[in-house]
Structure formats: C-alpha cells, structure tokens
Amino acid sequence: MVKKEKTPSPYTKPLDGGWGWMVVLHFFLVNVFVMGMTKTFAIFFVVFQEEFEGTSEQIGWIGSIMSSLRFSAGPLAAIICDVLGEKATSILGTFLVSGGYVISSWATGIPFLCVTMGLLPGLGSAFLYQVAAVVITKYFKKRLGLSTAIARSGMGLTFLLAPFTKFLIDLYDWTGALILFGAIILNLVPSSMLLRPIHSQSNNNSDIENKGSILSATEPEASYKTETSKCKETQEPFIKDSTMKKSEQPTTTLTVLGNQSEEFSNRPHRNRPLLMSNGKSHKKKFVSWNCKQKLLDISLFRNPFFYIFTWSFLLSQLAYFIPTFHLVARAKTLGIDVMDASYLVSVAGITETVSQLISGWIADQNWIKKYQYHKSYLILCGVTNLLAPLATTFPLLMAYTILFAIFAGGYLALILPVLVDLSKNSRVHKFLGYASFFAGIAVLSGPPIAGWIYDYTQTYTGSFYFSGTCYILSSVSLFFVPLAERWKRKQSDLLRTTIK
C-alpha cells in the first residue's frame, strides 16, 4: 500500500524578519559598495583617457567587461556556492573586487585594466550579488519584495558616490582613489559574516532539486534531511539485490515524501526511490549521484518557467541601460545645458529608489501575483520609451525621466521575488545563475547596439525606440505563465496516477 504524506520538515517557514534584516543590511552594502561604485566608472573613464591616451572604444571595454560579468558569471557563482557555501563565496567575491581595485592602481595600460578593473571586480560582483540574493530568499517569503527593495535601494546612493569619487581623485589622484576603494570594499568581509546559514527543508527540496521523490518507511530514521548549499560526498541507502523467498517478504507500507517531478520516471536506476522493508534498509556506501550532477545541472533547461523568466530578464536588461546611457547625450543634442542634464540622472536615481520601496511593499500584499505587477511595469516602461522622442524640452524630459524611473524601479524590485515564485523556491542558485548568464550577454551587447543605431541614424530617437521595443517584448513571455502552470499540473497529475 502506498500512502502520501507531506514532507516532514525540520524548518519550513522563513523568518520574515529577525536575523533576516542583517542579511538585508549585507545586501544593501553590496549594492552600495560594489554596484554603486560600478556606476561611477564614468568618472574613471575620463581619467583613463587622459592617462593612457586610449580611445573611447578601448576604455569602454573595461566597463563593459565589469558590468557584463556581474551577470554572465552567474553559473560559475552557483558552482562556487555549491562547493564552498554562501559565506565563503561572498568573502571570496569581496577579495576579488578589492584586490582588483588595488592592483589597478599599478596599471600600465588599458589591457592591464581590462583584467584588474574589468575581470576581477566583475567576477567578485557576481559572487557577492548572487550569494546575497539567494540567501535573502531563504530568510524572507511574505516580505521578500520589501526586503529586496530595501537592499536594492543602495544602488540609489550613486548620486552621492559620484561626487565622493571625484573628491578622492582630486585629493589623492586616481591611483590613491582606487586603493581607498579597495580598502572600503573590504568592509564586506565582516558584512559577509552576517550570512548565517539557515537549514530548511521545503516541499521542493533544494538538494534533491526535484529530480524525483523519496520513498521511505514510516520510521523517523528514514526521513531524508538535507543541508543547503555545500556539495559533499554522501552515503545513500539503496535496495540491495537479494533472492528472498516470496514467503519471507512481508507486506511493507511505503510513504511518499515531498512533491514529485515530471522527471521521476526517467531517472536512472541509481536515482530511484529509497525502498525500505520491515523498517530496515540494506545499505551500501557510494558517492551521491545527485552530488555529482549538482555542479553541472542541465535539468533547468527542461523547465518552462526558466525560459519564461530568462526571456523577460534578458530583454529587460538589454533595454534598461540604453536610456540610462543616452539620456544626457540626448539632452545635449536638444540644446539643454550639461549641468541641467545632470539633474536628470540625480532625479532618476532618487525616484527609482523610492519606486522600488513602494513596489516591493505593494507586491508583498499579494493582491495579485507578483509576475502580473512585473509584466505591467515592463509594458509601461516600453510605452514610456516609445514616447520618449516626443520629449524635446527640459520639462518634458524631466517628466519622461520620472515616469521611466517609477516604472523601472517597480520591475527591478520584483526581479528576485518573481524568480522565486517561478522557480517554486527550488534551485534558486542555478535558476538565477543561468538566467544571469544570458542577461550578461545582453548587458554587454546593448550599449554597442544602441551606439550603432545612433551612428547609422545620427539621432538618439532610434535608441529609445529600440529600448521600448525590447521592454514590450520582454513582457510577452510572462503571458505564458498560466499555460506553463497548467502544463505543470498535468505532469503532476500524470505522475501521481503512475505512482498509484
């Protein structure tokens, strides 16, 4: 007889507060020290042009490598997290960013800086950001939107870091400024120690990664308890070949633990359910097959929700940086003073920060599903950018800037909560890592594409049209979420029928 029970779990409810706010503090500092300083690269851009007499294209590669690696190194960050754990990975990322800035102070050329200020900080940023993002999902559920928005608001302090960076360069030269930046970022080492591990077991077990169910006897010792993050050698009991006589085989009650996935019936024999007879199991030591597959898990590519999220994430990241980079340049072509144009950037930063906080709080009220908010914000961003060429005066440009910052802040605050909802809170590391890899390609190619459009048309209106189109297209995949949910339910029903 087979009977179903819910997964016995030692800890299933996120704290939604308590020590979780310390994790939010760490995530906030990551956004301030790492992401905020990345945005101040424009100041070093001018300095490097004068120091090394390089072209804009050559020096632009430094910033492009740094920005794109924060996303495209996501799969590597996921693997490192599985091997070392979140806390060690975060500390490693801190040393990479800090060391990259310090070594850059001895730079002798642009290729040198591409490695020390592009590659190293880019990898470190990926490690820091992904670890903080994943750990915060373990501590928060009901308040995930608000907690993420508070953490991301650190990026809004860029308008304060820009004059601070200029002050350091004027006072200590660019070499001294880089050394000080490296020292400041080292504060993330004690901050990373706040990432207290939390061991939980949900219905969608993260270690098992939905690769199948576990069948066990009703004895407590048969429960399968997992530890998040680290991939270790484990001993798994499995059924031993035997020639028991029929009369010697007693009736066994089996308990189905957890939610089963559609992949259950296709798993190899060594990954089949754990069967126990008479409350006793025949055990043999071997290295966990799950652990071997953990470092290179391609099962995500059979998950429709992964494609839905990745399509939306890729195109929205492709679109986001284009108006950000070209806003001031477009204002200059309209005859607006550079100082007035710089106010647009400051207003955008402040508005986006406030918008993220409000968006996160609204999403946590669960009036509608979070991806519905996300989809609406993306569409509004697209419409706003498609109408941007109509803004030909400073007041109209200011109105466009405020509207775009409101809608952009709205969807940026919901990227992580939507990811958690679509991934069903399982394999968040891998889900975010692989999706970020494709987003990194978009970040690397977006500004050059927009630049090519300007070179071809000699106007920035084409860049805003391109951005608006990408935003509209990024929302399309989210319309397929209900279809994917129905498909998932059919697969679950079919699996339950097969087990019965």
Swiss-Prot record:
Q: Which PROSITE patterns match?
A: MFS
Protein origin, superkingdom: Eukaryota
Regions of this protein lying in the Cytoplasmic compartment: 1-16, 80-87, 130-153, 196-304, 364-374, 417-430, 485-500
Instruction: List the InterPro entries.
Output: MFS (IPR011701), MFS_dom (IPR020846), MFS_trans_sf (IPR036259), Proton-linked_MCT (IPR050327)
Q: Does the keyword Cytoplasm apply?
A: no
Extract the Pfam families matched here: MFS_1 (PF07690)
Q: What does this protein do?
A: Proton-linked monocarboxylate transporter. Catalyzes the rapid transport across the plasma membrane of many monocarboxylates such as lactate, pyruvate, branched-chain oxo acids derived from leucine, valine and isoleucine, and the ketone bodies acetoacetate, beta-hydroxybutyrate and acetate.
The family line of this record is:
Belongs to the major facilitator superfamily. Monocarboxylate porter (TC 2.A.1.13) family.
Q: What is this protein called?
A: Monocarboxylate transporter 5
Species of origin reads Mus musculus
Organism lineage:
Eukaryota, Metazoa, Chordata, Craniata, Vertebrata
Gene from which the chain derives: Slc16a4
